[in-house]
């Protein structure tokens, strides 16, 4: 997995969306990141690890290529604005769900 800066991540994410426009999917995950690079041991003493500030880890993949970035709490507003604009621009292939009318279901069958 490639760890990128925020701007590079958005550029690569745009490329992933363009590549998967006709067929394929892009999977995006977002989770809290505390800066650990090693897993927490199940048993034993836990070292006093204190994260310096809150961070978010974003990952994106198309099944073959994986990219990720870490966004700190200081730059989250700037990143969120650019990220939301990117999603609005590239999620135009979504289909609306067919809503079934309630009037047809409420009539008793005779």
Curated annotation (Swiss-Prot):
Pfam family, one: SRP14
Keywords: Cytoplasm, Phosphoprotein, Ribonucleoprotein, RNA-binding, Signal recognition particle
Cellular component, GO annotation: cytosol; signal recognition particle, endoplasmic reticulum targeting
One GO BP: SRP-dependent cotranslational protein targeting to membrane
Top-level taxon in the UniProt lineage: Eukaryota
Bias-annotated ranges (Basic residues): 96-110
Chain residue ranges for the region called Disordered: 90-110
Subcellular compartments: Cytoplasm
Subunit details: Heterodimer with SRP9; binds RNA as heterodimer. Component of a signal recognition particle complex that consists of a 7SL RNA molecule of 300 nucleotides and six protein subunits: SRP72, SRP68, SRP54, SRP19, SRP14 and SRP9.
Function: Component of the signal recognition particle (SRP) complex, a ribonucleoprotein complex that mediates the cotranslational targeting of secretory and membrane proteins to the endoplasmic reticulum (ER). SRP9 together with SRP14 and the Alu portion of the SRP RNA, constitutes the elongation arrest domain of SRP. The complex of SRP9 and SRP14 is required for SRP RNA binding.
Protein name: Signal recognition particle 14 kDa protein
